[in-house]
Every structure is written in structure tokens, then in C-alpha cells.
Amino acid sequence: MWKLKIAEGGSPWLRTLNNHVGRQVWEFDPKLGSPEELAEIERARETSLKVRFEKKHSSDLLMRIQFAKENPRGAVLPQVKVNETEDVTEEMVTRMLRRAISFHSTLQAHDGHWAGDYGGPMFLMPGLVITLSITGALNTVLSEEHKKEMCRYLYNHQNKDGGWGLHIEGPSTMFGTVLSYVTLRLLGEGANDGQGAIERGRKWILDHGSATAIISWGKMWLSVLGAFEWSGNNPLPPEIWLLPYMLPVHPGRMWCHCRMVYLPMSYLYGKRFVGPITPTVMSLRKELYSVPYHEIDWNQARNLCAKEXLYYPHPLVQDILWASLHKLVEPVLMRWPGKRLREKALRTVLEHIHYEDENTRYICIGPVNKVLNMLCCWVEDPNSEAFKLHLPRINDYLWIAEDGMKMQGYNGSQLWDTAFAVQAIISTNLFEEYGPTLEKAHMYIKKSQVREDCPGDLDFWYRHISKGAWPFSTADHGWPISDCTAEGLKAALLLSKIPPDVVGEPLVEERLYDAVNVILSLQNADGGFATYELTRSYPWLELINPAETFGDIVIDYNYVECTSAAIQALTSFKKSYPKHREEEVDVCIKRAAMFTEKIQASDGSWYGSWGVCFTYGTWFGVKGLVAAGKNFNDCFGIRKACDFLLSKQLPSGGWGESYLSCQNKVYSHVEGNRSHVVNTGWAMLALIEAGQAERDPTPLHRAARVLINSQMENGDFPQEEIMGVFNRNCMITYAAYRNIFPIWALGEYRCRVLQAP
């Protein structure tokens, strides 16, 4: 039976700043599990398989089964149901909230954070399996149980047409299909295994132009594997790292996720590295293409891209650039004396790879650069300490649910979910009943704050300050983020107002000041806030975005979510510490509010870049403006936002927004006009903040009825459609949102609507 282990090390090759607080790793123990538990898990798997085309999202049941045993509850209050003709009462809401918080508390790990599925993208695990296969570590790192669950996941998420999507809910793409197919083959599945599933996948690939039409990231992965030629790739010259920083195209000016992925890619491209050509690789050369491998026109393949994966088409200027580099520059750099420049560039790139590894304890900023960096360390020296330090951190990215084992989009969303959960529970004004839960969460927040900047010259390493920031996940990961810092600060300030005998001692003032310093340092010239760093270059740099399937990735753009979170955190801080950097804080809030108003769409919405989508963005937009001192009566933007949200309320009383809103940038309802508990929670929170109850509380009563009636018998909420997004086009799971936002919305509803004088 699989067991989730929290805050444990277990390897001499693991490094940590805080005794692994927040670390979540699944391990298989064949001796664990009663017959009843094993039968329950098997039923969950069978159900997941049966409904896989209708319900593509796991309900995270393996963790729930484990925690139900480890964190038993007392008697569960009776379920609440509200008829259409019945009024929602305070007693109903209070009982529902107690049921919800009691259940959510059982999902809290002993170190204080909430664990959960952060999967969704289908292109992450293939990079890991390809890297482990090349380095010969596949069978060392992955047990037979790991491989079985990875295969289960891939088979479960194959679409009806035989292909795989970019993410679990997406239509089939060449990128998703080729990489998933290759992964199954490397995991030991035969070319005709899977009850015809692999054959259907191969047919999809060949029917849609073969693997020559995979996007550039896929071309790179196939090239290092040996199932594609480097001459079929557009150039990724490592020499770009030797350019003067003053140039707008210097990678140090790019969004950190972008530069941290293209950093190791450029190393592998610069060396034209190819792994061992095994019998499986030789077979893939036949299976993936419609013509013999040696007859493929690799030069033509450079710019081929299947229409199913083409979200961001190459502009002409990019095609000219790649052709020039490919035909004129690369031949010079591959031979003496140009080769000396290449060797210098490769050394520089390796220095930056090692710096990233060491300062994230070998977790790395994300799963793509994690496995690429690991591969580069092996290419440099297969017996290196760096490669050995990478291996145990693979487990930090793996998550298992009833649909199988996946690779997550980060090493978790621990701090993010915990900060939101704290705010949700406190919003109910029932927090004294849940002191132990909040005390553990408080401990996690305190232990996860980044305590020091990265070492060395930050300008040389293209890093921003991080002392005082909060990361998205764990202190060991350590990358500072504007909105995570803001949400961490908000939660810490709320907890500081509750007696220490209930939630523990508050964070010391100096550490609050450090957090404020980080937030103030991240405001851009136009008043907005980006994610990890200041915006360092220009939007026109998107012209050289080579990733055909992602949008807006080259620079760190401003976002309404980050800007609003900063406003909220600073206004909360100002109430407790009005004299600390008073003028700077006031100016920052004012400029951020002006930016928020400026980017509002004409229909009253804000586009959400990290959640689905206009509902999410509009919640942040309204919250930010209200926190900055504006209200419905004096702010046209807030009035427009309320009109927008009310116009999207469904006949059921809820809201339900599809991920299609993100990629098409037009509001789209969930299929069948179904409501979604998370969208409904976001919309309620925005409307309550904007004073909807004072004008007409009916929409709020109707929405509250939807949330109450959605609650399950045990106090949990159903997992519905996917609610997270990144880079416009790829969806990602936030498993805790289904619990957090109904609690938060009904907590605010209880205190600010039903209990209003």
C-alpha cells in the first residue's frame, strides 16, 4: 500500500534548511494496509477507470483514505440540504461550516501544511522517465510499483481518439501524445500492449503527421533520447548567456521559469548530447514516423508543428532568426576557433545550473528544469555528487491518487494552500473551535518563510532578493514569489490577532518587516506586480518565444492576482504597523490600485492568469480595489465588476467557468452550464467584498444554497473541473481549492451577510 510521508528525509544525499518541513513523498510498503483499506483503494481505482472520459480529475482519494485513519474525527454533524423554496439560515451555514472545517482539518499534515494533488500537465512525467532511462537510473529510482502506477495514470488519461492532451482535460496534441507514448514504451510497455491503447496512440501520431510535427520542447526530448536528430531542432545557442546584460534579449532579463528551462536546454543543444541508442530507442525510430528514419528531412522538420498543439505560431521574424542561426552561426560555433566560444558558453551555463541546484536543495524551480538540470549534471559527470544529490529529490515531485502516479507542476503548493486555508477558517469567526489546526498552520507559515537571500552577487546570478519572502511550496525550494509573500503575510497578520494560547506566538516584527521589504521591492514602474522578479525586458520579446504551445512566457508580466495580493497585504500590515515605511507603503498601494483599474477589461472583468479565469481574476481585482479604499459607490470599476459577475450567474445560483476561458480569453461556461464550487466561492467573495448584501443579497443567498447543497456527507466537497492554469494554455490541479473556497465564501457570508446589522 502507498503511504504519504510528511517532513521526512531518509537519504544522506538530501539537504534541508528546516528539517524537511513541507516535504511530501509517497512510498510503497507491501506490508501496509488492512484488507478493507486495500479493497477501498481498489474500488476507487476501478471507479476512476470507469468514469475517466466524463470525470478526468482525480478526487485525491488515496491521501483521503490514509488521513481518515491517521486523523480520525468524532461524530459528524448531520448533512445540511436547502430546498429551493427554503431560506438559507445562519444555523444552516454554521453547521455546514463546522462540518467542512472539521473535515478539512483531517487533511492537514502533522507539520501544519495541507498536502494535495498538484498535477494536471501531461508533459512533465515524460521528461523524468526519458532522463532516468538515459542515465540508467530508471530501475534504481522507480520501483515496479512506481512504474505500474505511472502506466495506470497514462492509460487513464488517454483520450477516446487515442491521443493524449497537453493536460488531463485537454484535447489530444502531438506533444502530449508522442511523449506519453514514448514514456509508456520506456516504462516497459510493448508496442501492442495496453489492450490496444498503445496501438491507438501510435495511430493518432501517424494520422496527424508523425513525430516530426511535435513542438520544439518535444523535439528536444526526443533528440536527447536518440529518437530525433538535433538537426531537426531550431537552435538554442548557449552563447546567448555571454551577451551583455544591457541587451533586452539577455536571458537574465527573461521570466525565471523561461530562462531556467532554456538554460539546461541550451547546454544539451550546445553539446548535441544523445543518450545510449537502445533497442527500445531503435524501435521508437520506426514507430513514431511515417517514413524510414534515415529518409526524414530534418531541416524541414525544424519548423513543423501539428495544428493541434499550435497555440502560439512562430512569427516570420522568428523563422528568419532560427534559419540564420541554424545555417550560418551554428556551423561556425561547432568548429575551431568558434568552438572555443562554445566551450566557454557551456561552462557558463553549467555554473548557473549548479547555482540553481544548490540554492533549491536540488529541488529546482520546477519539474522541467529539475530533470533537465539533472541530465546536464550526468552529462558533465555520471558519477558526480550533483547527480547523486538530484536523485532523491525526484520523489518530491511525484504524487499518487486513484488515477495513478503523476509528476506535479512544482514540489507541491504547500504554503499557498496553507495561507488560503488560514484565511478561510478565520473568516468564519469560528476559529477558536479550531485552535490546534490553526496553530499547526501557523507553525508551517513561520517555518516556511525564506530567512536569507541567495549567496553571492545577486546581479551576477540574475536573482532578486528573497529574505523575508514566502515561496509557493517549501523553504527548501526557496524561490520568492510576490503573491505567495503577500498571502503568507496576510495569514501571519491574521494569526497575530488571535491569542497566542490558541494559535501560538506571532511572527516577530522584524520578519514581517522583511516581508514588506520584499513586496515593496517587487513593484514595477507602472505600479503592477509580476511573479518572482521585476519585469526586466519588453513584451516584444514574445516575438522570439519558441514554445509553440505556451503564451506569454518570455518575460515576467504584471498580473492582477499578484498586484491585488500586494495591495491587500500592505493594507493589512498598515493597520497594525501604520508608521513603518509609511510613505512608501501608501505610494505603493496607490500606484498598484491605479494599475489594477487600468488593466480591467471593458466588460468589468479581469483576466485571471493563474486560475480559471475571469471569475478568479475579478475576485482579485475587486479585493485589491476595496483594500485600497475604494467602494461600489465611488469606483466605476467595482460597479462594472459586479455587473460582470452577476451576468455570469447561472440559473442554479452558482458560477461555473471552463478552462477554455483561459486559452480563448472569452468567458466560457462549464459544459452543460453546471456550477462549480470553486468558481461559486470566488464570485461570492468578490460580491460580498463589493457590498452586494447592502444592495440586493438575493444572488448571494442563491449562491450559498449551491455551496451548501454541494457538500458531501462526510463534509468534503466534490472534485469538479480543473481550476488552475499557467502560460494561458496549460491547466493544473489545485486539489485543496474545493474545500478552501466554499469555507471562505460561506464564512464571509455568515459574518458579513447573515450577521450584518
Swiss-Prot record:
The active site is at D483 (proton donor). It catalyses: (S)-2,3-epoxysqualene = cycloartenol. Keywords: Isomerase, Repeat. The keyword Isomerase applies. CDD domains: SQCY_1. InterPro entries: SQ_cyclase_C, SQ_cyclase_N, Squalene_cyclase, Terpene_synthase_CS, Terpenoid_cyclase/PrenylTrfase. It is an enzyme of class 5 (isomerase). GO terms for cellular component: lipid droplet. Its EC number is 5.4.99.8. It comes from the Eukaryota. GO terms for biological process: tetracyclic triterpenoid biosynthetic process. One of its GO terms (molecular function) is cycloartenol synthase activity. PFTB repeats lie at residues 147-188, 512-557, 589-629, 638-679, 700-741. The keyword Isomerase applies. Oxidosqualene cyclase converting oxidosqualene to cycloartenol. Belongs to the terpene cyclase/mutase family. NCBIfam families: squalene_cyclas (TIGR01787). This is Cycloartenol synthase 2. It comes from Betula platyphylla (Asian white birch).
